[in-house]
Amino acid sequence: MELAVIGKSEFVTGFRLAGISKVYETPDIPATESAVRSVLEDKSVGILVMHNDDIGNLPEVLRKNLNESVQPTVVALGGSGSGSTSLREKIKQAVGVDLWK
């Protein structure tokens, strides 16, 4: 399984420097939508990393697909702080227990 990263240049640069090969630099919302659809169809991707704000800018249907996706597992970073709640909920959903309590 591979790690994929989607986002603007300033978000993906560090991942690219760390050696991640599946990096999709997307300057606008249509490019982000296209990259997300591509990654969702790619069975070799196990984890998708995106900026929380970019996920928030996606159409509702695509955002729902990301939230319900098991493979790839979507990790949202940065943004307004709601990303940690999202990660908490994903862990709770996967494990069945709230590990933060």
Curated annotation (Swiss-Prot):
InterPro entries: ATPase_V1-cplx_f_g_su, ATPase_V1-cplx_fsu_bac/arc, ATPase_V1_fsu_sf. Component of the A-type ATP synthase that produces ATP from ADP in the presence of a proton gradient across the membrane. Keywords: ATP synthesis, Cell membrane, Hydrogen ion transport, Ion transport, Membrane, Transport. This is A-type ATP synthase subunit F. Has multiple subunits, A(3), B(3), C, D, E, F, G, I and K(x); there may be a few other subunits as well. It comes from Methanosarcina mazei (strain ATCC BAA-159 / DSM 3647 / Goe1 / Go1 / JCM 11833 / OCM 88) (Methanosarcina frisia). Optimum pH is 5.2 for ATP hydrolysis. NCBIfam families: PRK02228.1. Belongs to the V-ATPase F subunit family. Signal peptide: none annotated. It holds the Pfam family ATP-synt_F. This organism has both a Na(+)-translocating F1F0 ATP synthase and this H(+)-translocating A1A0 ATP synthase. It is found in: Cell membrane. It is a peripheral membrane protein. It comes from the Archaea. GO terms for molecular function: ATP binding; proton-transporting ATP synthase activity, rotational mechanism; proton-transporting ATPase activity, rotational mechanism.
